[in-house]
Amino acid sequence: GVLKKEGDQFIVDLAGANIPLPKEKTADGALDAYVGKTLKVGIRPEDIKDDEEFLEKHSTSHLNAEVEVSELMGAEIYLYLTYQGQNLMARVAPTSKSRRGDKIVVAMDTNKIHLFDPETELTLLN
């Protein structure tokens, strides 16, 4: 994603979805040198969900994705998703109705987003 800054708010642009980063994670100024640059963005599958409560709580981090595979794994479902040509994986509740071929909205817990320098692969968020 491309890192942007509006005022004191850092935003990562994920192919058109502008995701604001939590200010407490960006307050140290370490990201200033990366504004306008493309960074690697990482998030664990358990921090991407499709349920209404999670979508409401994380209303600034929605992505419109397509379900490629829905795999029931006992107490949870793994959703293999595509978003703008990128592969994502979400670990969702077994009550999820998302199935292969569905176009769904997922949200990310922005407190759990990781940014990496694409050259050094060092993490950039505290």
Which role does the model predict for each range below?
Residues 2-3, 67:
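Conserved hydrophobic positions within beta-strands
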Residues 5-9, 70-77, 118:
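Short, conserved beta-turn/loop elements at beta-strand boundaries and strand-helix junctions
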Residues 90-91:
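Canonical phosphoinositide-binding patch of PH/PH-like domains
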